[in-house]
Amino acid sequence: MRLLCGSQNVQKMWDMSLEIILNGDYIMEYDYMPQLREADENGYIGIRGYLNFFQDAATRHMHDFGKGNDTIPEQYGICWMYTKYRMHLVEETGFEHPVTINTWIEKMKTTAVTHQAIEITCNGKQAATGRLESCLVDMKAGHLTKPSCIDFPENAAVDRQLQLEPFTRLPKNADGTDEVYRYVIRYTDTDKNRHMTNLRYVNLLMDAFDGAFYEDRI
């Protein structure tokens, strides 16, 4: 099912799309024209752009269910927290064609975390695939909670698994790592959860490595 947003009949489209979403097997799809701000140092859309697309798609997907971070903190005292990203970059893209982004929730045995799969294509060719892991956090108690606590649709997951390596279990401390630089968090870095917004982590991650690192791998 393909849903495109426009300026006309917005309420009618929303009512129709919400009915489709709540019926299950919902795969969100939309087109986006890349912008200069999303380009890497070489001028093409690559790591930075795709990771930002992943975040945009994942949050927009939750908004489609009516369960985005714009509303659930006030309604339930709960927020989404994205904890892991994995991306496979197939090829970089330019600015001549829009990218098509598909997002869906993968079926899992556990409800403690949610996995959103994302596929990006450009001009009919696969550009990147990825998976985002998120969890729901009770903002007052500070512990994890389940999707049922925000009345999330039980049939939201799609029986379609992305062919991508599983997440790596990360260490709980910084032993064996080197400090490369420090960053002071300011007001514009924070989000509704009073934590650093995920949008900032993309640049922080990329700046942890020098230019030679990327030249050898891209």
Regions found by a protein language model. Name each.
Residues 38-40, 93, 109, 124, ...:
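Residues that cap or initiate secondary-structure elements
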Residues 86-123, 218:
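Hydrophobic beta-sheet segments that form the core/acyl-binding groove
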Residues 14-82, 129-131, 138-217:
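Hot-dog-fold acyl-thioester-processing enzymes
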Residues 119-121, 126, 133-139:
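Hydrophobic, ordered structural segments
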